[in-house]
């Protein structure tokens, strides 16, 4: 089993802070995102590798286990001490697609619920829903003398992408060997709760907490979204239109003359759905770019501009 250096994958040191790791992930995820590299298999593999590294290093427990055991190339029997991880821990990636190193280290799948979530007992321990009817006393099984099963509510998390949360999505989860369909409403926010009444073991409820995954393109703050766009230096100086990616597609942003890097501009009504109706705004950070390579004509023009400013 080949050792995976997750710090090297993200280009950070082993002493990197949480914010350093998050920043490195966002930068690389944006660079290798499938939407920007359609049909590029190497970029897709890199994107998956970045996701695997971030899934480990962004979680304190995973990172501690990785730092303790990963560098030795020897994984303790059964994976890291404490067992597998619950759903919601893998940053939106399917852990079954991660490397053999990850599978050996962390066990890959979450217990209980297939797909993108995991069910837990009320005290937070991962549980297998099949065990709820297996004689676990207050956690399930048959009541003594009556032969009646206890009603058991189960809780879990369901991960959805930012786009799915915005548009709404149809999901299928596995509960106690049954496939249940549910609808995540459009405009759902992180932490929202969905209840499937009577669908749990013994006629209990299934309670789902929605986890909206981070998106390399957008940041959500209340009703507003924030993104960034590259603006060529001449456009920043003279003004002009640039294409901005929105959560529903793309739009045109008119950049005023004399704009500097870091300036925030607003596209009204292009943000998140409001509970009261309508949508918030999309804020766009301008990233003024300078070409690394110049044609002879461009070089001459830049030299003339430089000379004028002396």
Curated annotation (Swiss-Prot):
GO terms for biological process: chaperone cofactor-dependent protein refolding; DNA replication; protein refolding. Keywords: Chaperone, Cytoplasm, DNA replication, Repeat, Stress response. Residues 5-70 form the J domain. CDD domains: DnaJ, DnaJ_C. InterPro entries: DnaJ_C (IPR002939), DnaJ_domain (IPR001623), DnaJ_domain_CS (IPR018253), HSP40/DnaJ_pept-bd (IPR008971), J_dom_sf (IPR036869). Its main location: cytoplasm. Residues 257-276 are annotated as: Disordered. One of its GO terms (cellular component) is cytoplasm. One of its GO terms (molecular function) is unfolded protein binding. It is found in: Cytoplasm. Participates actively in the response to hyperosmotic and heat shock by preventing the aggregation of stress-denatured proteins and by disaggregating proteins, also in an autonomous, DnaK-independent fashion. Unfolded proteins bind initially to DnaJ; upon interaction with the DnaJ-bound protein, DnaK hydrolyzes its bound ATP, resulting in the formation of a stable complex. GrpE releases ADP from DnaK; ATP binding to DnaK triggers the release of the substrate protein, thus completing the reaction cycle. Belongs to the DnaJ family. Homodimer. The J domain is necessary and sufficient to stimulate DnaK ATPase activity. Zinc center 1 plays an important role in the autonomous, DnaK-independent chaperone activity of DnaJ. Zinc center 2 is essential for interaction with DnaK and for DnaJ activity. This is Chaperone protein DnaJ. It comes from Deinococcus proteolyticus (strain ATCC 35074 / DSM 20540 / JCM 6276 / NBRC 101906 / NCIMB 13154 / VKM Ac-1939 / CCM 2703 / MRP).
């Amino acid at each position: 089993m080949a050792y995976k250096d997750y710090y090297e994958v993200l280009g950070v040191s082993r002493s990197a802070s949480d914010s350093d790791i998050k920043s490195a992930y966002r930068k690389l995820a944006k660079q290798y995102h499938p939407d920007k590299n359609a049909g590029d298999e190497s970029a897709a593999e890199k994107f998956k590798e970045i996701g695997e590294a971030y899934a480990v290093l962004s979680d304190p427990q995973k990172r501690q286990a990785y730092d303790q055991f990963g560098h030795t190339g020897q994984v303790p029997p059964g994976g890291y001490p404490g067992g597998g991880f619950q759903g919601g821990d893998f940053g939106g990636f399917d852990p079954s697609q991660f490397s053999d190193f990850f599978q050996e280290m962390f066990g890959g799948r979450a217990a209980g619920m297939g797909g993108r979530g995991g069910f837990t007992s009320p005290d937070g321990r991962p549980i297998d829903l099949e065990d709820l009817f297996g004689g676990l006393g207050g956690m399930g099984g048959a009541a003594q003398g009556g032969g009646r099963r206890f009603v058991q509510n189960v809780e879990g998390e369901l991960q959805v992408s930012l786009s799915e949360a915005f548009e709404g999505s149809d999901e299928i989860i596995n509960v106690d060997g049954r496939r249940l369909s549910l609808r995540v409403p459009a405009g759902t926010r992180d932490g929202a709760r969905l209840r499937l009444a009577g669908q749990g073991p013994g006629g209990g409820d299934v309670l789902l907490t929605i986890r909206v995954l981070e998106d390399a393109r957008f940041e959500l703050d209340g009703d507003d979204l924030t993104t960034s766009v590259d603006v060529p230096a001449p456009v920043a100086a003279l003004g002009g239109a640039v294409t901005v990616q929105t959560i529903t597609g793309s739009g045109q942003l008119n950049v005023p003359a004399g704009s500097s890097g870091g300036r925030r501009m607003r596209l009204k009504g292009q943000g998140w759905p409001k509970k009261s109706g309508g949508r918030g705004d999309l804020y766009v950070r301008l990233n003024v770019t300078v070409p690394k390579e110049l044609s002879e004509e461009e070089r001459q023009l830049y030299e003339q501009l430089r000379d004028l400013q002396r």
